[in-house]
Amino acid sequence: MNRGIIVTGGGHGIGKQICVDFIQAGDKVCFIDIDEQRSIDFAKEYQNLFYFNGDIADPLTLKRFVEYAMEKMHRIDVVVNNASRSNNKGILSSLTYEEFDYTLSVGLKAPYELSRLCKDELIKNKGRIINIASTRAFQSEPDSEAYASTKGGIVALTHALAISLGPDVLVNCIAPGWINVTDQQEFSREDFAAIPAGKVGTPKDISDMVLFLCQQDFITGETITVDGGMSKRMIYHGDWNWFYRL
């Protein structure tokens, strides 16, 4: 398709799969990641894949990243805001103001700033913004305030951007559930039983939805949950073999 795609956190997991799938669709991809060696090795695998090293919490880094992407691809058609700081810490761990703010900078402020920096190019090209949230935007475990706040925020940012930038730019969000981004290959029967679809998700499950949304012209402002139905299961202690242990 020869589009110009930029992806944050593209060196591993979901972001890496997104990069691969756009490349295989015939696009050019420029990604930013903080893990330099891992990303350099990945970028060597594809001719039309370009890597920029940096921390997206820094707005100057984002500006330079966009300039680099334009230098390499000469256009930007799609922005995928994938990167986040996923450490599960919050009030029970006495997470500091500074640590909370950094998590917001990576997971919420950076997606806004990157969207702002790319706005004119996206409008010109009738582009797309795809934000990656999480089912943590809607349900929580203890001690997860920082991460949950970024994911709830990016859901709201999605529909706000969709209204501001439409009809020229369509903006959507994906909320993944349990996605295996590790080398673990085996899971217990109980793991599978917790998910109505009967499997643990893969980065490909999320990437497929990203590419799908980039092909549509009548979906915008939406957050689409991709979690195998896990968040839809109603659980009561002692019901249907579910037990809460204290």
Predicted regions and their residues:
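Canonical Rossmann dinucleotide-binding motif of NAD(H)/NADP(H)-dependent dehydrogenases/reductases
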Residues: 1-30
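Short C-terminal tail/terminal secondary-structure segment
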Residues: 89, 220-246
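Substrate-binding pocket helix/loop in short-chain dehydrogenase/reductase
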Residues: 90-92, 96-101, 191
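Active-site helix of classical SDR
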Residues: 115, 150, 158
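Alpha-helical segment proximal to the catalytic Tyr-Lys
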Residues: 120, 162-167
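Residue(s) in the substrate-gating loop at a strand-loop-helix junction
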Residues: 134
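C-terminal substrate-recognition "lid" of short-chain dehydrogenase/reductases
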Residues: 202-226, 231
